């Protein structure tokens, strides 16, 4: 498997530090508000990475943190007249609700920053002792950026360029404008902990370094997050961790691309974000997950209702194909008709193609293409009146269903009961489009009566009325069935 390493700006063969084992850390949410679709993308990307690494045989220890002490949390708590802890607990709970519906597997460990204050203070003290950090008279602790020769290597930024125009804000006691906070001295209205440098709270960057070292050891194999974290957060993590341990902090840096709305990065700070719950109000969670897997994870993803509609159609095709294959395999008797040689070749090509796509920097978009390739292959076999009866067709369909079962575990989609999913999808679409199912059932029954009475003018009029609602009717041997176009 190859992964794109942000540090080297190239795809590299993935080789773990300890053979067969992977230590992986991903920056989690700052728990002060509902999660948006950008959080959903990052969660899905790294969930699939963990799933695939396990699929190909790695024992993955996955850690994802919660930032439960931060300026934004404190600001919200003060505005609501409550505590930072209450705010953090509230939004950690909503995070779990959203992510469980999205099919995100729970990590091996989910540390909260406030649970590791001692480790953070210890790390800051080590940096002070080694000359990489300093305590100010007011009790703040800053990291000396210029003391770390590799600063900027992840983001590709030059220290001198960053220094140009930078200023120390009034009231700050930094030696250099580039220095960043490891520990913030206590202030009224903020949570506080004791430390060797006096009462205060940790800086944001310190927590991930301390928790990853404590829970995973150094160096970790994979550190993940959104591209917005490359600078300053991950750059600062590298500086403080490598300055403290005197060696490599992380071997592979993996970052997912932004979600964009109207070509702009979506974020809370820009005020153009769409919460996950906004989407769940109109689409099934699995449709959102499918949509997020429709592009390569490093590429920008443009959000739109049209994109979700296309994802809905796509996942419906897969589930419908599963139902058709399961029904086809219920045949009591099979012929010995031989399949063309290219059928098994096509099947193998898509199976190998799926693996090759996932091995190529987790290219889920290309992998999905091979899923649909097997949907088309199954459709051709079932539609051919002669081949549909062949025992060899049954073997191919069984193999495709088995492939889908394995791939569903890897991707986290199309793995539930197909009939139940299609019923839920239909109900969701009816609600979103404002279509009354009872009215449709009545019109379909009325059309059926008209057909029996050979009143084809009335039957056609009802069909047109249904079409105006976006409903199509299929006449089957067991009676009419309808769906939303």
Swiss-Prot record:
Binds 1 zinc ion per subunit. Disulfide bonds: none annotated. One of its GO terms (biological process) is cysteinyl-tRNA aminoacylation. Pfam families: CysS_C (PF23493), DALR_2 (PF09190), tRNA-synt_1e (PF01406). The keyword Aminoacyl-tRNA synthetase applies. Gene3D superfamilies: Cysteine-tRNA ligase, C-terminal anti-codon recognition domain, HUPs. Coiled coil: none annotated. InterPro entries: Cys-tRNA-ligase, Cys-tRNA-synt_Ia_DALR, Cys-tRNA/MSH_ligase, CysS_C, Rossmann-like_a/b/a_fold, tRNA-synt_1_cat_dom, tRNAsynth_Ia_anticodon-bd. Its main location: cytoplasm. GO terms for molecular function: ATP binding; cysteine-tRNA ligase activity; zinc ion binding. A motif ('HIGH' region) lies at residues 29-39. A motif ('KMSKS' region) lies at residues 265-269. Belongs to the class-I aminoacyl-tRNA synthetase family. HAMAP family: Cys_tRNA_synth. NCBIfam families: cysS. This is Cysteine--tRNA ligase. The lineage of its organism: Bacteria, Pseudomonadati, Thermodesulfobacteriota, Desulfovibrionia, Desulfovibrionales. The gene is cysS.
């Amino acid at each position: 498997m190859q992964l794109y390493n942000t540090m080297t700006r190239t795809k590299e063969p993935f080789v773990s530090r300890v053979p067969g084992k992977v230590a992986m850390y991903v920056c989690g949410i700052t728990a002060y508000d509902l999660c948006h679709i950008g959080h959903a993308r990052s969660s899905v990307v790294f969930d699939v990475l963990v799933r695939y690494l396990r699929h190909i045989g790695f024992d993955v220890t996955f850690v994802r943190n919660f930032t439960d002490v931060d300026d934004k949390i404190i600001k919200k708590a003060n505005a609501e007249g409550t505590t930072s802890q209450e705010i953090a607990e509230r939004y950690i709970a909503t995070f779990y609700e959203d992510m469980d519906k999205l099919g995100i597997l729970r990590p091996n460990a989910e540390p909260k920053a406030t649970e590791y204050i001692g480790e953070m203070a210890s790390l800051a003290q080590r940096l002070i002792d080694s000359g990489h950090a300093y305590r100010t008279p007011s009790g703040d602790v800053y990291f000396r950026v210029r003391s770390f020769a590799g600063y900027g290597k992840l983001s590709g930024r030059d220290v001198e360029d960053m220094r140009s125009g930078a200023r120390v804000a009034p009231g700050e006691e930094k030696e250099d404008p580039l220095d960043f906070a490891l520990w913030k001295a206590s202030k009224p209205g903020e949570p506080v902990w004791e430390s060797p440098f006096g009462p205060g709270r940790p800086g944001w960057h310190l927590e991930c370094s301390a928790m990853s070292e404590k829970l995973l050891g150094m160096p970790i194999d994979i550190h993940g997050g959104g591209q917005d974290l490359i600078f300053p957060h991950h750059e600062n993590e590298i500086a403080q961790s490598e300055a403290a341990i005197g060696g490599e902090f992380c071997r592979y840096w993996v970052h997912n691309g932004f979600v964009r709305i109207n070509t702009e990065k979506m974020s809370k700070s820009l005020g153009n974000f769409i919460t996950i719950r906004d989407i769940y109000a109109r689409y099934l969670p699995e449709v959102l997950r499918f949509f997020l897997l429709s592009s390569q994870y490093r590429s920008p993803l443009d959000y739109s209702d049209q994109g979700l509609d296309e994802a809905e159609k796509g996942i419906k095709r897969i589930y419908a194909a599963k139902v058709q294959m399961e029904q086809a395999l219920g045949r009591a008797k099979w012929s010995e008709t031989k399949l063309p040689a290219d059928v098994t070749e096509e099947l193998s090509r898509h199976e190998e193609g799926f693996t090759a796509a996932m091995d190529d920097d987790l290219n889920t978009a290309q992998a999905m293409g091979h899923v649909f390739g097997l949907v088309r292959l199954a459709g051709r076999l079932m539609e051919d009146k002669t081949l549909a009866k062949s025992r060899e067709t049954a073997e191919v369909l069984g193999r495709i269903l088995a492939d889908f079962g394995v791939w569903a575990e890897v991707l986290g989609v199309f793995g539930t009961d197909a009939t139940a999913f299609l019923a839920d999808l239909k109900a969701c679409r009816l609600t979103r489009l404002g279509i009354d199912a009872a009215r449709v059932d009545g019109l379909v029954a009325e059309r059926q009566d008209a057909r029996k009475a050979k009143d084809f003018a009335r039957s056609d009029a009802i069909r047109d009325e249904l079409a105006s609602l976006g409903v199509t009717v299929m006449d089957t041997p067991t009676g009419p069935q309808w769906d939303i176009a």
